[in-house]
Amino acid sequence: LGDVYKRQVNISVDNTHIPNGMEQDSEKECNRYSELIKSLGGIDLQLLGIGHNGHIGFNEPSDSFEKQVHCVDLTESTIEANKRFFESAEDVPRQAYTMGIKTIMQAKKILVVASGEDKAQIVKEAFFGHITPYVPASVLQLHNDVTLVADEAALSKIY
């Protein structure tokens, strides 16, 4: 992720922070990353995509919005969606560190990107449906500074 980001965005690497995916001690890395976020005064801008099931930041549908930074087992659909970034499906990690919903919601500003007709239904549910951890992105309705950047196709079910 870091290498892809650095090639695409004109922001100093010193101003970006990504969990160390090579750290084997997940509790240690989650704590380190949480403390880093706190020490820097929180997250200024949280950039998110939205998954077909409403997941954000590898936070799959569940029964809670309370998690902070944590390690997750990736679902088969998430592995499938991310294999385009790797040479083969076998190279895609099966676990990832992610900010939990609680951490995401503490960001000062959140920018959500959605594209394609296949995202239209979940965009409608997330931004105009009931707030539920079974559609994780729906919690963004409670944040005071969220911007959705989407193409016409992704917005087609809301107008």
Tell where the protein language model's regions lie, with residue ranges.
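Short, small-residue-biased leader/transition segments that mark boundaries at the very start
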Residues: L1-Y5
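Ligand-binding beta-strand-loop-alpha-helix segment within the catalytic cores
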Residues: K6-L45
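Solvent-exposed alpha-helices and their adjacent loops that cap or buttress functional pockets
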Residues: V9-N10, I37-L40, F65, K102-Q106, ...
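Short, flexible loop segments at the rims of nucleotide/cofactor-binding pockets, characterized by
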Residues: E23-D25, E87-P93, A126-F127
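A short secondary-structure junction signal
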Residues: K28-N31, G57-S62, Q68, I122-A126
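A glycine-rich beta-strand to alpha-helix segment
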Residues: E35-P61
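Class I SAM-dependent methyltransferase SAM-binding "motif I" and its flanking Rossmann-like core
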Residues: G57-I101
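ATP/nucleoside-binding phosphotransfer catalytic cores, i.e., glycine-rich phosphate-binding loops
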Residues: K102, Q106-Y159
